[in-house]
Amino acid sequence: MTFSRRIWDLLLVATLLIGSAFIWSTRVVPGAPATAPAPEPAATQPAPLVGHPAPGFTLSAIDGSQVALDDLRGQVVLINLWATWCPPCRAEMPAIQQAYERFRDQGFVVLAVNQQEDAARVVAYMNEQRLTFPALLDSDALVGAAYQVRVLPSSFFLDRRGVIRAVYRGPMSRGIIEGTIKQLIAETP
């Protein structure tokens, strides 16, 4: 038997022994106590879903006023979670502004919920970009957590009853924004 053949045989035997030991150590023994079940996930509430009521919140706007989502029942609402440092967020803002100007007199409201930035930075950005829709400050990211936002921007369209009707993760085009708004405005309350 050659030297290389002997090495391959030893490797094969070692692999079989290790595999057998692993299988033996993980076997189920009748009458042995069961292990504890895995702990429940940390999240205590499910992610907001299309067709379900939107989680309520009250936040400070950059003008100092308080805005409560529940007070906007009867209107079509776009909740847009964003940040000034987020390039995709910045890219969709002009289309959101155009939609706001076009549909606000038809019962459409934008709530631009900024994630964890200070008011001065948000005010400067809104002024620089000439954005006139309400910008809210989610300083502790509580709304972001309630809506289980993992990517910015994230947008939630609500019908007049406060039910989530569409969710978009990432930037939206003008066509998506306006098409969704038109559909929701056309519905009877």
Label the predicted regions.
Residues R73, L81-Q98:
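Conserved redox-active cysteine motifs that mediate thiol-disulfide chemistry
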Residues A124-T132, L137-T188:
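Thiol/disulfide oxidoreductase modules built on the thioredoxin-like
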